[in-house]
Regions:
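Aromatic- and glycine-rich peptidoglycan recognition patches
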Residues: 6-7, 106-171, 175, 184
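Secreted/periplasmic proteins that engage bacterial cell-wall peptidoglycan
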Residues: 1-120
Length: 184
């Protein structure tokens, strides 16, 4: 079954359990960064939490180690080089840890919008990246995408309209509660 994708375009709240360590009452199994239990700022903690959040699950099999190793980990998820909503995008990095982020939007020209966090950097930020290699600079090397188990529908997709012949009344198939749902 398909689900309408809910984009994250702002930082998660400090109380969002997807970004709080399990030992502090949250759902996240990644390394704790802040004394309050937050796993942010860290790309691994963010991507792990966001992947679970978007699918409304409390745990997943994604790696919790170096982001540069995520793409080649045998975790049971499908992979590829074509972006999908909610997918984890993975990069390795020359001489250091890689980076992971989440695909929040795919534009008609092939560009993608990602949501991110960075270890010792920003708690939350967005990037627009260009195909085919979705470059983050010369030291990062695009590996591919780890796909979510959920088949997401883009919230910008036009909504089908059904017109009944007798009444000429248009019935709109509308998922308002999903489109207007705010993520904390």
């Amino acid at each position: 079954m398909s689900t309408i994708f809910v984009r994250r375009l702002t930082a998660p709240s400090e109380s969002n359990l997807y970004y709080i360590k399990t030992t502090k009452g949250g759902y996240n199994k990644c390394i704790q960064i802040k004394p309050n239990g937050s796993v942010l700022p860290n790309c691994v903690g963010y991507a792990w939490g966001r992947y679970c959040e978007e699918q409304n699950i409390h745990s997943c099999n994604l790696s919790r180690g170096d982001a540069g190793n995520w793409y080649y980990k045998n975790d049971g998820y499908s992979r590829g080089r074509i972006p999908k909503l909610g997918a984890v995008i993975c990069w390795s990095k020359d001489g250091g840890a890689g980076h992971v982020a989440i695909v929040e939007k795919i534009y008609s020209n092939g560009k993608i919008l990602t949501s991110n966090s960075a270890y010792n950097g920003s708690r939350f930020f967005k990037e627009t990246l260009n195909p085919p290699n979705y470059s983050r600079g010369t030291r990062y090397h695009f590996q591919g995408f780890i796909y979510p188990d959920t088949d997401f529908i883009d919230p910008d997709t036009p909504i089908p309209t059904i017109e009944t012949p007798k009444t000429k009344f248009k019935w709109v198939l509308y998922a308002k509660k999903f489109r207007n749902r705010n993520i904390m």
